[in-house]
C-alpha cells in the first residue's frame, strides 16, 4: 500500500 493510503486496503 502507498504511504497514507493504507486505509484503502479493502
UniProtKB/Swiss-Prot annotation:
One of its GO terms (biological process) is neuropeptide signaling pathway. It is found in: Secreted. FMRFamides and FMRFamide-like peptides are neuropeptides. It comes from the Eukaryota. This is FMRFamide-like neuropeptide SAPGQDFMRF-amide. Keywords: Amidation, Neuropeptide, Secreted. Belongs to the FARP (FMRFamide related peptide) family. Expressed in the CNS and thoracic perisympathetic organs (tPSO) but not in the ring gland, midgut or abdominal perisympathetic organs (aPSO) (at protein level). The modification Phenylalanine amide is found at residue 10. GO terms for cellular component: extracellular region.
Amino acid at each position: 500500500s502507498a504511504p497514507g493510503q493504507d486505509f484503502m486496503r479493502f
